[in-house]
Amino acid sequence: FGQMMVKDHSAANAELGQVAAEMKIVPPTEIDKKHGELVERLSKLHGAEFDRAYIMAMVEGHQAVGAQLGEWITASRPLGPPPDGDRKAADLARGGPNEEKLTQWVMRTLPTVEKHLEGALALQKNE
């Protein structure tokens, strides 16, 4: 499972990097605080305790990412920046010439995220 995660995530991130470059968006180069804390917590665990925590993180993470990607596809809010002016990368793409590129990446990536979630749930069920 872990090897599949590395392979699939590396491929998706490389492809997203190409899309971001075409959109002239510079992606973050460092891990965010939430994921940094997860890595730190997991690095202190071993054996079955690590396995349980890792699988739980994979379930929660893939549920969240799947929901975000699904929201992108079925966005019901008007396109453009949010009213508070906080323009995230996804909002910069909305309504612009690059929206289709990002939407295509999302549509190619969502099935993989769903496959990872199914795998993590199966592992969680079998512990």
Roles of regions detected by a PLM:
Residues 1-127:
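His/Met- and acidic-residue-enriched segments that coordinate or traffic transition-metal cofactors
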